[in-house]
UniProtKB/Swiss-Prot annotation:
Residues 440-471 are annotated as: Disordered. Its main location: cytoplasm. Keywords: Cell cycle, Cell division, Chaperone, Cytoplasm, Isomerase, Rotamase. It comes from Synechocystis sp. (strain ATCC 27184 / PCC 6803 / Kazusa). Gene3D superfamilies: 3.10.50.40, Trigger factor ribosome-binding domain, Trigger factor, C-terminal domain. Its EC number is 5.2.1.8. Involved in protein export. Acts as a chaperone by maintaining the newly synthesized protein in an open conformation. Functions as a peptidyl-prolyl cis-trans isomerase. It catalyses: [protein]-peptidylproline (omega=180) = [protein]-peptidylproline (omega=0). The lineage of its organism: Bacteria, Bacillati, Cyanobacteriota, Cyanophyceae, Synechococcales. Belongs to the FKBP-type PPIase family. Tig subfamily. Consists of 3 domains; the N-terminus binds the ribosome, the middle domain has PPIase activity, while the C-terminus has intrinsic chaperone activity on its own. GO terms for biological process: 'de novo' cotranslational protein folding; cell division; chaperone-mediated protein folding; protein transport; protein unfolding. This is Trigger factor. It is found in: Cytoplasm.
């Protein structure tokens, strides 16, 4: 079988396949024989219909079309195997089907033209990846991080002490009954809003909590005092009954509790850590936060390099890969929304238009991801970078332990680990070559520097775990 390849745009390959006459005749005869055995024609027993009658009743065009479709499928499979093509996705017919039917002769060769996406090769200027210049934010260690951590642990272990001799203050926990009312024309409480009512509700009196005005209104109230607090709800508030509305909240303060924090002493250090003294704990925390700042800076540098790396890619991307990456990003978004407690099924019940919008919106990110991944693969090949078997085994063992009890597809786990370790090694090498300007934290907007997601690896492992029973 003669196969001629043609490179097409968008990482496609065109094939011109010349099917020999022997194959055409064999398939055509098999189609006719199958039809004589299966077709139902009045006046004839099933399987006993003469060949001429079958051709007359069904028509040459139908029989030719059936034979051609079978020839196309068979010849494509043979061509892919013969030419060792890295095909992704399905083939499309470039020849005109009606014309093929007209010219088809079972006694003669048949030439068809098809096209398919192929796995792309990274195209880039030679050694351009050795000359990357980028900007990244430098994360500086702050002693405040230690103080904030200790304060957080204090608050977790705070004792709630009833307050009776003073009004509510910021930092207190207030227990309230509340109801909401529409604002009447005279500015007084009008009709009650049934959806907004509660009793024995705990309100932590901190700035930024709840709808603006509630906390400020409660601060200064005494126990058993009732007060009307005017509030304006934001337009995007999830409860439709009050979204964008001016509302009067009737608040009755039933209890005030003060958060009494434990002393930051050696006993506290023993309670929250493995250390016996507060000095030891603070020293360890300082070391941890210094290392964390260094790691975040390193992550920022690598993220900046990855973004620049994708920009060096000059080749074409196949549509099949772009669609697959869009699907992956939409699925990842759905997982993130579910983690936030949102009902993703409601989002997708809005119809195919909503799903397509999500895919369209993810397309730029999908393209950027693919370009970067292809460049990393090309550099790994060029620089002969790959993890050792021992490194892969060690990381796989760590992840198996981390996700102990979960169902894991071993093949996908190994592939994921090999890919992530290779990427890490490539980025370490690029970091040595790159000229990266470090800027103060907050200097770059999110669009200029992509900060790595702390959950990225976890999501990848979740994907590794998601093996259906059908696989």
């Amino acid at each position: 079988m003669k196969v001629t390849q043609e490179k097409l745009p968008d990482s496609q390959v065109g094939l011109e396949i010349e099917i020999p006459a022997t194959a055409s005749k064999k398939v055509y005869e098999n189609v006719v024989k199958k039809l004589t055995r299966t077709v139902n024609i009045p006046g004839f027993r099933r399987g006993k219909v003469p060949r001429a009658i079958v051709i007359q009743r069904l028509g040459q065009s139908y029989i030719k079309a059936t034979a051609i479709e079978e020839l196309i499928d068979d010849s494509i499979k043979a061509a892919v195997k013969q030419e060792e093509l890295p095909i992704i996705g399905n083939f499309s017919l470039r020849s005109d089907m009606e014309n093929l039917i007209q010219i088809f002769d079972p006694e003669a060769p048949l030439t068809i033209k098809v096209a398919a996406d192929v796995f792309p090769e990274a195209e880039y200027e030679p050694e351009s990846y050795k000359k990357i210049t980028a900007q990244a934010e430098e994360i500086e260690y702050s002693a405040d991080a230690v103080d904030q951590w200790l304060k957080g642990e204090q608050e977790k272990r705070a004792t709630l002490v009833p307050v009776e001799d003073r009004p509510a203050a910021l930092g207190d926990l207030a227990i309230v009954d509340y109801a909401a009312f529409q604002v009447a024309e005279d500015g007084q409480a009008g009709e009650a809003i049934a959806e907004v009512k509660g009793s024995d509700f705990e309100v932590t009196l901190e700035d930024g909590r709840f709808v603006a005005g509630i906390v400020d209104g409660i601060v200064g109230m005494a126990v058993d005092e009732t007060k009307l607090i005017p509030v304006t709800f934001p337009e995007d508030y999830p409860l439709e009954a009050v979204a964008g509305e001016d509302v009067l909240f009737e608040i009755k303060l039933k209890e005030i509790k003060f958060r009494e924090l434990p002393e930051l002493d050696d006993d506290f250090a023993e309670d929250v850590s493995e250390f016996e003294t507060m000095a030891e704990l603070k020293a360890d925390l300082e070391k941890q936060f210094q290392e964390q700042a260094k790691q975040r800076t390193d992550d920022n540098i690598k993220a900046a390099i990855k973004k620049k790396l994708g920009e060096l890619f000059t080749g074409d991307l196949p549509e099949t890969m772009i669609k697959q990456e869009c699907d992956r990003l939409v699925a990842q978004t759905a997982m993130e929304l579910e983690r936030m407690g949102l009902d993703v099924s409601q989002l997708f019940r809005q119809g195919d238009d909503m799903l397509q919008t999500l895919k369209d919106n993810s397309r730029p990110e999908a393209i950027a991801n693919l370009k970067t991944d292809l460049m990393i693969g090309a550099i790994a090949k060029e620089e002969k970078i790959q993890p050792t078997e021992a490194e892969v085994k060690e990381r796989c063992d760590e992840l198996r332990q981390e996700f102990k009890g979960e169902k894991i597809d071993e093949s996908r786990l190994v592939n994921f680990v090999e890919s992530s370790l290779t990427e890490s090694k490539v980025l370490d090498l690029l970091k040595e070559w790159a000229d990266v300007e470090l800027l103060p934290e907050g200097s770059l907007s999110q669009t200029e520097e992509d900060t790595p997601d702390d959950d990225a690896e976890e999501e990848a492992i979740v994907d590794v775990e998601a093996t259906s029973d059908e696989e």
